[in-house]
């Protein structure tokens, strides 16, 4: 039963890119909708929990919210450039490599021979998976788009990795972070989406896009609960399975075109990224 609960974050987070893309809208509208949805959920959670706020908790959580918006906005741009089925495995892989290396360098997480061996195998699998999922059979069909997408996803990963490093480095409790983090998300989204488009940031579509924001925030709370039930290492590993839903869903539901060879490479690449993520979780608990 605990494992089933621990799979909820992967299920929720895996569907978010599909729902956002299906709902459409500009990157600005999607970013505002997501952050407003997350804030709405955070306010509701506030009344059903007993968070403890300190200046450090509020300040660091607010900054992580700003970093999340950077990560999310650039990831949304990548969806439009190279598609969900290609962007999600690459994005997940970059985040895994980034958080793992920061964990090793800053927090000395690989302190045994076994962890070092498992960690390097995991990184090799993830990097291999990224290369496979980014493969394009016909180079003229999107080499420039892929380069642009990779740069965009790298910036996105920096935002997400920075978030994780701050939360871990300052030992911020998940429940305590939710509301100030969501406030940081909305304020930074308002600033980042202020210019860069002619369409309205707030309309009916923006309201509709709060739904995936609520779903993401629910996955965040579920992750906090899952970590308490099965441990951080197992919870982290299981959360990586969301990329399978996003990738397969992008191909089937969003009808993103792939050649037979590209499809094979994407599937194998996703498997490698997931295995790498699981191995990192094993290394954390070893």
Swiss-Prot record:
Single Gene Ontology MF annotation: carbohydrate transmembrane transporter activity
Recorded family membership: Belongs to the GRP transporter (TC 2.A.7.5) family.
Keywords, ordered alphabetically: Cell membrane, Membrane, Sugar transport, Transmembrane, Transmembrane helix, Transport
Organism ancestry: Bacteria, Bacillati, Bacillota, Bacilli, Bacillales
Record membrane topology: Multi-pass membrane protein
Organism annotation: Listeria monocytogenes serovar 1/2a (strain ATCC BAA-679 / EGD-e)
TM helices/strands, residue ranges: 4-26, 33-55, 114-136, 149-167, 177-194, 207-226, 230-252, 264-283
InterPro entries: Sugar_transport
A GO cellular component entry from the record: plasma membrane
UniProt protein name: Putative sugar uptake protein lmo0176
SUPFAM superfamilies on file: Multidrug resistance efflux transporter EmrE (SSF103481)
Domain of life: Bacteria
Alphabetized PANTHER family for the sequence: TRANSMEMBRANE PROTEIN 144 (PTHR16119:SF17)
Compartments (UniProt record): Cell membrane
């Amino acid at each position: 039963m605990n494992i089933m609960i621990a799979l909820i974050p992967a299920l929720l987070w895996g569907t978010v890119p599909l729902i956002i893309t299906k709902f459409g809208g500009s990157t600005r509208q999607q970013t505002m909708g997501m952050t407003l949805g997350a804030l709405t959920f955070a306010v509701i959670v506030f009344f059903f929990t007993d968070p403890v706020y300190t200046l450090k908790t509020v300040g660091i959580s607010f900054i992580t919210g700003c970093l999340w918006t950077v990560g999310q906005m650039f990831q949304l741009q990548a969806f439009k450039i190279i598609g969900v089925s290609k962007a999600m495995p690459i994005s997940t892989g970059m985040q895994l490599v980034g958080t793992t290396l920061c964990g090793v360098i800053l927090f000395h997480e690989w302190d045994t021979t076994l962890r070092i061996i498992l960690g390097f195998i995991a990184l090799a699998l993830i990097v291999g998976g990224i290369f496979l999922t980014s493969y394009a059979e016909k180079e003229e069909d999107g080499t420039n788009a892929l380069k642009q997408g990779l740069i965009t996803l790298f910036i996105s990963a920096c935002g997400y990795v920075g978030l994780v490093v701050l939360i871990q480095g300052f030992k911020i409790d998940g429940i305590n972070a939710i509301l100030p983090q969501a406030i940081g998300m909305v304020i930074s989204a308002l600033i980042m989406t202020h210019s860069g488009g002619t369409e309205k940031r707030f309309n009916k579509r923006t309201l509709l896009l709060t739904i995936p924001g609520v779903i993401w925030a629910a996955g965040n709370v579920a992750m906090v609960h899952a970590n308490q039930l099965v441990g951080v290492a197992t919870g982290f590993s299981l959360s990586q399975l969301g990329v399978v839903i996003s990738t397969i869903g992008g191909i089937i539901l969003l009808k993103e075109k792939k050649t037979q060879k590209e499809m094979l490479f994407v599937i194998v690449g996703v498997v490698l990224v997931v295995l790498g993520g699981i191995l990192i979780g094993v290394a954390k608990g070893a």
